[in-house]
């Protein structure tokens, strides 16, 4: 009798401009796929009250983070508002080896890096706004953006949209429920396909 091959976890990556509903859709996906886990990022920022290492973030010293960078320990990393953030390659591999499917929130550069590392085990989903005008309205309705911040987010969105055709699927979030259903269908199809090793 042939030995049964254990299932290897899969990676679902969301990339999207700010204001496209990514966080809301991610919550709905995790509700629909209860065995899927949200990837925990590493950071050098100080732990806040109530946060737990390994749950909210993997909290690393600046020295340890920079050592991981030098040793190729990140799928992606960035320096943002004075702190490093990144996705640890080893933690991702460990989850996959345990058969755990992960949902990752990465920028387009990080998504491209992940696809190079895990071409057959990853689904890249780009969530797009119906138009730049709608995106601008959504960002303004948050009332959390000053004029300069809004301008920067819209410029970044234009750049990110230029990468959309390199993703496995592009979902336009015009109506939230339709977008959620489209994302769930894409993930269901991906998870049901046979993996190549």
From Swiss-Prot:
Residues 9-188 form the Guanylate kinase-like domain. This is Guanylate kinase. Gene3D superfamilies: Guanylate Kinase phosphate binding domain, P-loop containing nucleotide triphosphate hydrolases. Essential for recycling GMP and indirectly, cGMP. InterPro entries: GK/Ca_channel_bsu, Guanylate_kin-like_dom, Guanylate_kinase, Guanylate_kinase_CS, P-loop_NTPase. Its main location: cytoplasm. It is found in: Cytoplasm. Belongs to the guanylate kinase family. One of its GO terms (cellular component) is cytosol. It catalyses: GMP + ATP = GDP + ADP. Keywords: ATP-binding, Cytoplasm, Kinase, Nucleotide-binding, Transferase. Its EC number is 2.7.4.8. PROSITE patterns: GUANYLATE_KINASE_1, GUANYLATE_KINASE_2. Disulfide bonds: none annotated. ATP binds at residues 16-23. It is an enzyme of class 2 (transferase). GO terms for molecular function: ATP binding; guanylate kinase activity.
């Amino acid at each position: 009798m042939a030995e049964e091959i254990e299932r290897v976890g899969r990676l679902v990556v969301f990339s999207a401009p700010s204001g496209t509903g990514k966080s809301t859709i991610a919550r709905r996906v995790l509700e629909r796929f209860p065995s899927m886990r949200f990837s925990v990022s590493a950071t050098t920022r100080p732990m806040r009250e109530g946060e737990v290492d390994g749950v909210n973030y993997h909290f690393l010293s600046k020295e340890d983070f920079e050592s991981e960078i030098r040793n190729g320990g990140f799928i992606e990393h960035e320096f943002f508002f004075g702190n490093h953030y990144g996705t640890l390659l080893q933690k991702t591999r460990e989850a996959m080896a345990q058969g755990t499917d992960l949902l990752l929130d990465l920028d387009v550069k990080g998504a491209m890096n992940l696809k190079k590392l895990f071409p057959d085990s990853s689904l890249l989903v780009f969530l797009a706004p119906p138009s730049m005008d709608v995106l601008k309205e959504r960002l303004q309705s948050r009332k959390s953006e000053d004029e300069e911040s809004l301008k920067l987010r819209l410029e970044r969105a234009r750049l990110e949209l230029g990468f959309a055709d390199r993703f496995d699927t592009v979902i336009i979030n015009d109506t939230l429920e339709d977008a959620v259903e489209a994302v769930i269908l894409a993930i269901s199809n991906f998870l049901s396909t046979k993996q190549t090793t």
